[in-house]
Amino acid sequence: MPFDHNDHYHRLLLRQLPPGCRTALDVGCGTGRFARRLAARGIVVDAVDPAAEAVAAARELTARELSTRELTAAAGAGERPRFRQADVTQVELPRGHYDFVSCLASLHHMPFDTVRALRESLAPGGVLVVLGCYPERSRTDWAWSLAAVPVNAAARVAVALAERVRGGRPAGPGAVRAPVAPPRMSYAETRREAAVLLPGCRMRRLLFWRYLLVHRAPDGAGAPGGAGGN
C-alpha cells in the first residue's frame, strides 16, 4: 500500500479523544482503517460512507482482522465498527450521543455546514475532529505545499522499500479507493466558516495538504473562543 496522507495522521487524531470516550462516529470511513483503530480502544463505533464498495471492503477487512492484535480490545468487548452505507447529509444523527466524531478527508465532499449536524450529535464534552483538505490559494498555502513535496517523496520511497522487503502485499479489499473530489473551500474560507459554525474550535495547517480542525462541545467547564491557528 502506498504512503497514505490520512493514515499518517491517525496518531494525531487519536490524541484528540476525550477522556473516557465510549462512542464514536467516523464520517466517510472508507475501508474502515481509522474506525478499526477506534474500536481497538474499546469504543463503540458507527462508521458511515456513501460508497457501497468502500463499506463492503471495510466489513471484509474487519472480519479478517478480528483475530489480530489491532482489534483484541474490541473483540474482547464484543464490539466491532458498525459499518453503514449512508450519506451523512441525508440521515438524522442522534443528538448529544457521540463522544467523538471524526471526518478524515471527507468533509470537502459535502456542504461545510454539515458540521452543524455533526456538532449537534456530540455529547457534552465530546470532540469533533476534522482532517481536512484545501486548495492552494495563497502564498502561505503554496509555502506549505512546497515544504511537503520532499517529505512526501521521502515517505513514499520509505514505504515502497518497506513493502519490497516484506515481499509486497496482494491486492485485496484494502486496495479499494473511495471516490475523490477536489476541495473547494480555501484554508482561509474554512477557518472563517468554522469560527461561526463551531464556536471555540481550533484549526491549524498540517503537511501533506491537510489541516486539523478540533471542536469540543461545551461541558460547562469554560467559555468558547474563536478559531485559532495559522
Question: What are the residue ranges of the model-derived segments?
Answer:
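A conserved beta-strand element that flanks and buttresses the S-adenosyl-L-methionine
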Residues: 102
